[in-house]
């Protein structure tokens, strides 16, 4: 198998929040619907079984009105530490979000891993900015949750 570094988009962001506050935004389907996806996208979540092996079905609504059905399976969940899904339809990938406590908050480590280097390279120009936007939307949702608390 090809090295994971060559077939993954990896990035991280430091959020001024506890791992518990960040995980709350990742584990509540209503909150996930607000931050999931790149800028301009909205989401309808049809099923969100937040447990290892659980199904996650959603439709992402693009800014141009195009609907993108998505099917994923939660592969690993560790409260306040890890959220991992396998995306099953369309482009197959594994997405891992790790929460690392830091003095200034929580570092979110995001890694989207494709099956092959070729698959990743075909999508890299879209994936990189989309993942940056996704993390920015997660950060905004975490802050929104802190204000509401």
Task: Give, region by region, the residue ranges found by the protein language model.
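Hydrophobic ligand-binding cavity/cleft-lining segments
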Residues: 1-42
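Hydrophobic/aromatic beta-strand elements that line small-molecule binding cavities or substrate pockets
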Residues: 11-13, 46-48, 70-76, 94-101
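A short, structured loop/turn motif at beta-sheet edges
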Residues: 19-20, 51, 75-80, 98-107
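Hydrophobic pocket/interface hotspot
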Residues: 22-26, 32, 56-58, 74, ...
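Glycine-rich portal/gate segments that line the openings of hydrophobic small-molecule binding cavities
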Residues: 44-86
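Beta-strand/loop substructures that line and gate deep hydrophobic ligand-binding cavities in soluble
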Residues: 84-133
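Short, highly charged C-terminal tails/helix-capping segments
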Residues: 140-149
């Amino acid at each position: 198998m090809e090295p994971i570094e060559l077939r993954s988009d990896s990035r991280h962001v430091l959020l001024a929040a506890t791992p518990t506050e960040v995980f709350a935004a990742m584990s509540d389907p209503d909150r996930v619907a607000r931050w999931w996806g790149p800028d301009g996208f909205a989401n309808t979540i049809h099923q969100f079984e937040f447990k290892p092996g659980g199904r996650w079905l959603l439709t992402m609504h693009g800014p141009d009105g195009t609907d993108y059905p998505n099917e994923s399976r939660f592969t690993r969940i560790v409260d306040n530490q890890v959220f991992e899904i396998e995306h099953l339809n369309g482009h197959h990938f594994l997405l891992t979000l790790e929460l690392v406590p830091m003095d200034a908050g929580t570092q979110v480590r995001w890694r989207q891993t494709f099956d092959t280097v070729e698959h990743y390279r075909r999508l890299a120009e879209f994936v990189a900015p989309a993942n940056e936007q996704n993390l920015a939307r997660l950060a905004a949702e975490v802050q929104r949750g802190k204000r509401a608390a």
